[in-house]
């Protein structure tokens, strides 16, 4: 068995806990959701009066194999129901104060205190989630692995190499000019090195798994490509949404959960076929659940939500 890796999936906007893992025969659920309720005939039962959303059949397959842990009622004290503050808490693991560093960024620095792994973490999407932010923690943000890299628009190899060398020289010469320039220059060099490493992973990837044509599936395929390449990446991060279903609640959530369930299943299948699944777990979370009572055809911000941990090394079941 090799180094352990984690793929973090953020369901942005507040995934509706009660329509994801459904207490379908609970009278409080039935009475409070006359309009935004999944009826018993559509639910995929998992026992104890609970069932998965009807579009989560692929997650149910993994659940039946003992690969899925369902973690109920996940939240934090004195919930404020704000998207922004809730995400801050999830990203920093600081429920009582505003934190500056992310829990995954801190984990990177603990694993690599010398900052010598420039591809320790990869975020799929624009920007950088606060969860991955920590002083000195190297993180690459990728929107498309097929086009990722520097100077890819320069077709002539010699010209491209000359341009890259110019950047390396520029950053290298600034080191030793003071702490600020040292930090900026080292960050630049790390970015160049990381882009060179990550830019080559698609050439090494071969798989028969056919991912769906949506942004989440694309990110999960990218995570599989990165992790199967064994370049040293320990953390992959992606997000999907928005699950903020104040209106059109059932249709919106089911469309997004279809993407998520398919992407997770295909990623697991891909890693399994490559004999890499033993070393990887997936952690799926959302900032909060939705209120028990519907608001007509949607739901408003709630508190406790549901999280999932998925993988070969997971002791599946309900927690």
Kindly label every feature range from the protein language model:
Residues 1-274, 309-310, 314-319:
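Feature for exported/extracytoplasmic and membrane-associated proteins, marking the mature portion
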Residues 264, 271-296, 301:
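Metal-dependent active-site segment of extracytoplasmic phospho-/sulfohydrolases and closely related
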Residues 297-311:
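C-terminal, helix-dominated tail/subdomain
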